[in-house]
């Protein structure tokens, strides 16, 4: 694995407040890394330090193996796209995309070729002569991306780039981002608070909370095995049950089934239905169950089996296969 950038014990304090707390992080070259976590966890602060917009209180940031902790942003060779696209309104789409190339004094003929190629890459070749304000949000987003990519950055940094788009477009642009990253082989670091976005896009996802890294790895490894309750909650796990030996287990609502008999392996709990919410293809069945230790735990089962007819007040059994019961460290 070639390393594009590295955080070594990087801390950022604002007065008494520690926004980023001694993180170590490796950004692999040619891959897409997401920094994922709730608001305030230090994602943007980390990205800004990587970009050079803020200097760590302590620790080092290496880019291509070179200590770049104090290198100014314009000398880091990075492309960046923010939540607000920050396009130049008085320039055409092509001029926006060519802006960084002009600054770098690329000859006009070559610049024209690179701009055309980059606009084709993001599917906007036909809008080269338009002004940004004539474009939809999704199109403006692509222009901002094209402008950042045109300079062939060592690292492409994206801060919540899709969060201003409506839900449908956002999902479409995820696929587009993946395609563009695969076609260009760029190293991308993306900040998001959206777990679905991180799961779908990442080669490596880094789950953060309160300035620390809780877990990192490929989505296929992190998702089925969250390191602790905080990561599990952030990834949409519910139904936390403590067993007699003190271990904490969790099951996703879609893996809890209504059954007529206890299953031998896995988890089975009995309880009373509190609520049934109809949601079209599925129903959310809320149950107050006995955890086997005399305590009541509230469980939610996402039931897709139309034959199940649970009603509030019914006593039912909820069960999950062993394969879907995740044991947490803490
Ligand atoms: P969000 O998604 O809301 O941007 P985030 O995970 O990106 O969240 P950061 O923007 O990195 O979080 O902020 C982390 C914490 O540091 C927050 O509590 C924020 O208020 C604080 N913070 C960030 N920048 C500064 C600053 N310049 N001065 C003081 N506090 C700051």
Walk through the language-model features, giving the residues of each.
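Helix-to-loop junction immediately C-terminal to a conserved catalytic motif
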Residues: 51
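The feature captures the beta-strand-to-loop junction immediately N-terminal to the Walker
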Residues: 36-38
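Non-catalytic connector elements of ABC transporters
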Residues: 247-330
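ABC ATPase nucleotide-binding domain
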Residues: 6, 26, 62, 317-319
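ABC ATPase nucleotide-binding domain helices that frame the ATP-binding cleft
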Residues: 44-47, 143
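Conserved ABC transporter NBD signature motif
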Residues: 59-67
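ABC ATPase nucleotide-binding domains
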Residues: 32, 73-79, 83-227
């Amino acid at each position: 694995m070639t390393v594009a950038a590295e955080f070594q014990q990087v801390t950022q304090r604002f007065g008494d407040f520690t926004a980023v707390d001694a993180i170590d992080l490796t950004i692999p070259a040619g891959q897409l890394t997401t920094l994922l976590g709730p608001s305030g966890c230090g994602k943007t602060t980390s990205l800004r330090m990587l970009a050079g917009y803020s200097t760590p209180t302590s620790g080092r940031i290496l880019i291509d193996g070179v200590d770049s902790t104090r290198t100014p942003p314009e000398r880091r060779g990075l492309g960046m796209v923010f939540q607000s696209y920050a396009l130049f309104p008085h320039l055409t789409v092509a001029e926006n995309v060519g802006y960084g190339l002009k600054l770098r004094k690329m000859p006009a003929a070559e610049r024209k070729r690179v701009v055309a190629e980059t606009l084709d890459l993001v599917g906007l070749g036909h809008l080269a002569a338009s002004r940004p304000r004539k474009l939809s949000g999704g199109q403006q987003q692509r222009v901002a991306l094209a402008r950042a990519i045109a300079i062939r950055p060592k690292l492409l940094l994206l801060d919540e780039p899709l969060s201003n788009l409506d839900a449908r477009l956002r999902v479409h642009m995820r696929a587009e981002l993946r395609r563009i990253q695969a076609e260009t082989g760029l190293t991308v670091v993306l900040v998001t608070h959206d777990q679905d976005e991180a799961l779908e896009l990442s080669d490596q996802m880094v789950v953060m909370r309160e300035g620390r890294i809780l877990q990192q790895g490929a989505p296929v490894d992190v998702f089925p095995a969250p390191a602790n309750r905080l990561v599990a909650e952030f990834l949409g796990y519910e139904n936390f049950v403590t067993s007699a030996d003190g271990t904490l287990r969790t099951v996703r609502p879609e893996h809890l089934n209504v059954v007529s008999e206890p299953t031998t392996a896995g988890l089975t709990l009995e309880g009373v239905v509190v609520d049934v919410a109809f949601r079209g293809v599925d129903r959310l069945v809320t149950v107050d169950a006995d955890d086997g230790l005399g305590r009541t735990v509230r469980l939610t089962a996402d039931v897709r089996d139309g034959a199940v007819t649970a009603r509030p007040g019914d006593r039912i059994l909820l069960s999950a296969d062993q394969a879907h019961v995740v044991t947490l460290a803490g």
